[in-house]
A protein has these predicted regions:
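N-terminal subdomain of nucleotide-sugar transferases
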Residues: 1-49, 53, 94
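Extended catalytic core of nucleotide-activated donor transferases of GT-like folds
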Residues: 54-141
């Protein structure tokens, strides 16, 4: 039987942020389950980051290097830093069964807009201390 593929969209799991620590803890446990293949779409790092080599699961760096032609698009799009521009490319490459995210709604809402949304299960845990609370709360009522 084929392994279930899980993509975690997040701040790179080796950074020193709350989201990164949470992600590292979750992915390190999921990685140990033989039935799963896990990867992360790692925000705020580019392909030259040395930590990618030592990460035991797949890593798709979100940030282009300055020499890439996509760098100007990345710098010109405020939500590109959260994965907006690279998400669909990663979906096509990794083809996850499940996409997970634990950030603020405005950091992950592009995942709902993806043209590939019907092809993955979406497990999100948006924080509730963020703005805009009224709009976010309506999503779950």
């Amino acid at each position: 039987m084929r392994k279930k593929k899980i993509l975690f969209v997040t701040e790179a799991s080796w950074l020193s942020t709350g989201y990164s620590v949470y992600t590292k803890e979750v992915l390190s446990r999921l990685h140990q389950i033989p039935e799963f293949e896990v990867a992360e779409l790692a925000c705020y790092v580019d392909r030259n980051d040395k930590n990618i080599q030592s990460t035991p699961w797949g890593v798709y760096p979100n940030k282009p290097v300055p020499q890439d032609e996509s760098y100007s698009l990345y710098k010109g799009n405020p939500i590109a830093q959260f994965g907006d521009l690279s998400f669909n490319h990663v979906l096509m490459s990794f083809q996850p069964d499940i996409v997970m995210d634990i950030r603020d709604w405005w950091m992950l809402e592009f995942e709902q807009r993806s043209p590939f949304r019907d092809f993955y299960h979406w497990a999100i845990m948006p924080t509730v201390d963020a703005e805009p609370q009224k709009q976010t709360a309506r999503l779950y009522s």
